[in-house]
Amino acid sequence: MLKNKFNASEVEPRLYKAWEESGAFKPRKPRPTDTPKDNYSIIIPPPNVTGSLHMGHAVNNTIQDILIRYNRMLGKAVLWQPGTDHAGIATQMVVERKLSKEQKQRKSMTRDEFLGHVWKWKSESGGNINQQLRRLGSSCDWSREKFTLGDPENSDDNMSEAVTKAFVDMYNKGLIYRDKRLVNWDPHFQTAISDLEVENIEKDGSFWHFKYPLAGGETYTYIEKDDEGNILLSEVRDYISIATTRPETMLGDGAVAVHPDDKRYASIIGKKVKLPISNRLIPIISDEYPDPNFGSGAVKITGAHDFNDYEVAKRHNIPLYSLMDECGVMVDSEFMPKKYVGMDRFKARKEVVKDIEEEGCLLLIEDKKVMQPFGDRSGVIIEPMLTDQWFVAADKLSENAINKVNDGSIKFVPDNWKKTYDHWMNDIQPWCISRQLWWGHQIPVWYGYAKDIIKDETSNTKKNDDKKQLIEFVAKSESEAISMAEAYYGCRVKIDNNKGKAENKIVKIWRDQDVLDTWFSSGLWSFSTMGWPNKTEELGRFYPTSTLVTAFDIIFFWVARMIMLGLHFMDDVPFNDIYIHALVLDEQGKKMSKSIGNTLDPLDLIEGVEIQELIAKRTRGLKNPDSAPKIAKATRKQYPKGFEAYGADALRFTLASMAGQGRNIRLSVDRIAGYRNFGTKLWSAATFGQLNRCNSSSSYAPKDVNHVLNKWILSEVSKTIDTVTNFIESYRFNDSADEIYKFSWDTFCSWYLELVKPILSDSHNAYNKETRETFGWVFDQILKLLHPFMPFITEELWHNLSESRPKMLIVSEWPALPYDITDESSVSDVKWLQMLVTNLRSVRADMNIPPSKMAPLLVLSTSLDERLNLFAGQLKPLARVSGISLSEVVPRGALQTVVEGVTYAIPLDGLLDKTVERDRLNKEISKIEVEISKIDNKLSNHAFVSNAPEKVVVLQKDRKLSYLDELEKLNLALINLN
């Protein structure tokens, strides 16, 4: 027997363990009849090893698990490949902080010593997120779990080999190269970072307007005009005006650019200006980049410290002046005024402004909000820096990747993301893949000095250090690098990371100390996880993968790169469909963020959390600690008791039901509670079925049923199966969830269960056995349809409702019928019954008639509809009908309703005290009229309508419409009563 209620906290972990131990998460064995369509695979977007489950993970993995469980039930061989990302900068930061608390510093250790600490941390604390994914119900094949950095203790692990082979192969084909280019530089971590790791935040700032004097004291007539050509200003100037938010960078200016169509500056294009402070002469150039309508229309070009300026500088061969070292400190260089050497960039900013003002070249300081780039982990302002890095020639890989999306080989869902993909790919830049970290795949490149330099050094012939040339030995291993070097030098070679040259006729080479961008190894994820570069059975069965489920913000950083690398190495797309899921927002529609304290931990919703712990979580690690009291107050107001334990099923179903294509999810805790109640409703229905011996039978044949109610429910479940299947296949998860919900709650529980009670309660009824078996069979279909969305409660019910199940629900067959069981006549008859019952209930409710009171039903017709006799047993309990009879006239004051053109009446005599009811109705009418008057006063107040937010005004208008509708019903009830 079923227990009184479903205990998610006890059942969910138990069932997950049973699934995993049974091998249900592993792909089934190949069959001789298998075709590619019989295999289905998804690669999990590998979460950071440092991470913990957040709502983005929850919706992403819920959708993946729905697809995985659905395809598994279709009988396919299913692989859901799990794993984690080594998360270079994030992991290194976590371990450095941990060591700092132990009074240890990375820089005081050797590389190997530090990496030993990181691997130890990973074995003890890393990968907690995988346990959290298990708690969500994710049915990954954990026996195949991968780590982007590989497993150094497992000789069979191929992940490191895959990355090294990919790098060497691409280098040999000219797709990877070393270059000096502009990158996002984090002065705190002293490494290049990706655009995704840069957080642009609006801050209070300034625009400093400077004068750059024309060289040689030249002048020109500066004229400003309005849109109609009228002259607003005309004056002779001996300078050009520029504005900047970063005054310190003017020390590295290489030019001033103006638009070719800007007539104000046409006469001075090609001339030079004298750079204040340093007094260097730089040219005025013509370029499309400046906007004549923004500021003065003239732009300083600092090619070594601004991405847009860098492109302008390249077009015009403008010199690049690097101002800072890796710490953001001004460098000692021939173009740098000695005063600034060794200054921090922000101190230099103040000094530059001060010195320019003293030179008389400061025009204006304008206070403005300024977008500033911050490192998302370091929290410091990012500096565009010109550094030596390794790059992928992405433009050589992009054309094929664009074509595969355009020809339909890869499909985006929703398809509007294809435009975003095309935009990025058609404007693709070299991909910086090197990072100045220790944690990661060390770049497989060794360096040595050119042969002529080695020869000169050993013969004591001195050469200028600036002319030294490095030879690159790109190899899959250290021994291979040594062999390559020995072939080049013609003598013995050894590794010496101190970058020596030669000693006792042994040449020294050293390895590149940088590591690869995490996105490089994760870009190989779709095939490296299946054993590449080895030719494995998994690659043959599961590559290309079927569907990628991911967020929009990594379409370029991960998705596009996987497509490019998959096509390059596998000569095939990495996946067929890309489903871009929605963003999870809070109830007010705001993006969830730790900084504003509105995040919700999925595990708190699954397992419950007390208010104090919830507040502690939301106020821990804030970028602005001063906001903690405000966040605590808001949290206490919104969730005064914290959260109940809603269970994984309720959270999953909520996320699925709100995951409409192209729509963000406004997560409501009330809605999660509502879907927990949905599970309770199913549990109650199952209990009712069990008490009435409603078990499905192996001999049950839906096509052989005879009773109209059973034919109807079979017709409805058949339609639901088709609809849900089509919705899942179309990635319409919200529609499929809603369809299951409506059928389960409304059609089955609210109608069928109630309609068949008279049959089930009568053991002598001819249709008792058929109805019990139909009930059980249909409920089984509900469990199957619902299983991908709510796997735990459905599996528990599946086992408890029958002890003879041959298989667990997780590996049972998806509902499908070999024949049509739709009976339109039965559907029509029951639809009529539902309309009649609904209408009768409605008119009774309008008059406040207690459900306990039975009433006769009068039919204004010459003959009784045969359906009244057919459903007499259902009408009496559901519509509280004491008897049915024909009538030629409607009794005075009787309640009336019309169904399919026939009038049905309920006499009021004896059902209620008319005087009491009349008083109640008049009071209700008066209350509503007062509310309508209040709303009218607000809406007629010009100040309210003008100043209130639009949604507040709309809400008042909607309230009025609702009150007017209610008022109409009350007046009608009063008329009927009188």
PLM region descriptions:
Residues 1-261, 302-315, 319-334, 345, ...:
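N-terminal, positively charged nucleic-acid-binding surface of large information/translation enzymes
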Residues 56-68, 75-76, 84-85, 162, ...:
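Structured ligand/cofactor/substrate-binding pocket environments in proteins
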Residues 189, 278, 378, 449-451, ...:
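Short Cys/His-rich metal-coordination motifs, predominantly Zn2+-binding knuckles/fingers
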Residues 209, 427-520, 524, 568-648, ...:
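Feature 926 captures the class I aminoacyl-tRNA synthetase adenylation module centered on the KMSKS loop
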